[in-house]
Amino acid sequence: IAAAGNKKFVMIAGPSSSGKTTFSHRLSIQLAAHGMKPHPIAVDNYFIDRHLTPVDEFGEKNFECLEAIDVEQFNKDMLELLEGKRVEMPVFNFKTGTREYKGDFLQLDKDDILVIEGIHGLNDRLSYALPKESKFKIYLSALTQLNIDEHNRIPTTDGRLIRRIVRDARTRGTSAKETIARWPSVRRGEEQNIF
């Protein structure tokens, strides 16, 4: 990425709780070690307000579809950053279900790079306005296998569910019961939008 010199956007994608955020921060450390100035950005901060979120065929809010993201605002902000403009970055408040602006401004210099992570990171419809040559794409998934014994293992999907339960409780004000209840919808969204 550093050697290419023309990349301004590292687009990271993977299923829910696969380690995208952790990876984006670790990658940022490595990019900084190569003289770049990385700025991690979570696509989740571009969610539309919860009451506007589309519903799936089961009547549940579909947070996994691209239509749950304000794609136009995302592209507007990224293009303005690419042009060197100063942009106020949003933060999605998962407790209130609204996007907020708290005075967090970003402006890119020559050596700056955006490390963007979200389940739709590889979807060209998310970043349709960004020049293709400016993007470097990475897919990742949690493949850590846990074995109960020599013959039985815990599926990686179950490991991701456990990671999501912890994350949702810590950062999104969601109970384990709510996260488990949403998991089938999350899995359907992964099948439709990622795999």
PLM segments and residue spans:
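Conserved NTP phosphate-binding and transfer environment spanning the P-loop NTPase/kinase superfamily
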Residues: 3-5, 124-195
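Hydrophobic anchor at the beta1->P-loop junction of P-loop NTPases
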Residues: 10-12
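Walker A (P-loop) phosphate-binding loop of P-loop NTPases
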Residues: 17
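Post-Walker A helix-loop "phosphate-sensing" segment adjacent to the P-loop in P-loop NTPases
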Residues: 29-39
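Conserved nucleotide-sensing/catalytic segment adjacent to the nucleotide-binding pocket
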Residues: 39-41, 48-97, 113
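Glycine-rich phosphate-binding loop used to anchor ATP phosphates in small-molecule kinases
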Residues: 75-134, 179-195
